[in-house]
Amino acid sequence: MTSETSTLPHAMRGEANPAAMAALAIMAIAAATLAGAWFFQLVLEILPCPMCLEQRYAYYFAVPFAALLAFVAAKGAPRSLVLAGLAILALAALGNAVFGAYHAGVEWGLWKGPTDCTGTGFNPGSAGSLLDNLDKVKIIRCDEVQFRFLGISLAGYNALISLLMAAIAAWGMAKTSRR
């Protein structure tokens, strides 16, 4: 390899770029997960609880952030910047995995969930307002499973998918730090 080609970004030298590959994989997984969540909600009419909606935030963050990271990694951004971006994705995914596991534990009754979505903090107000609101509000409880596949709820799958995304980010970090 000549000194001229060694200064080019890895992609321009025909080499694989693990950071860009990891970021693109995370972006694709996050986008597919969001598409699945919206499919369940809009087509199958499996409505999300408040905790389910909050778990989507990590995916909403990951799609554009991972796309931007893949772009700058492919363009030869400084290694420290790319590693920091992958670390941010890994931490966001790990945090979401913990949140998903917590939610799955609430569904299994292992611990109590937030009172605003588990039905334990119900305040009926007056009898008249209660009757007026009964037909208007559909409360989706966080401690009731809306859908299971192979015995795992959507919150459980969120934890597993988030762990996969964190592992991909860690792989990208390990490969990038060795370059």
Residue ranges and their predicted role:
Residues 1-18:
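Short, Lys/Arg-rich, polar N-terminal cytosolic tail immediately upstream
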Residues 32-41, 94-110:
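C-terminal TM-helix exit segments that contain a strictly Trp-centered aromatic cap at the helix terminus
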Residues 17-27, 75-97, 167:
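Interfacial segments of alpha-helical transmembrane regions
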Residues 136-179:
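A hydrophobic membrane-anchoring alpha-helix module
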Residues 26-33, 40, 65, 69, ...:
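Hydrophobic residues within membrane-embedded alpha-helical segments of Major Facilitator Superfamily
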Residues 68-76, 170-177:
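Structural signal for the C-terminal ends of transmembrane alpha-helices
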Residues 108-153:
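Extracytosolic (periplasmic/ER-lumenal) interhelical loops and adjacent juxtamembrane/interface segments
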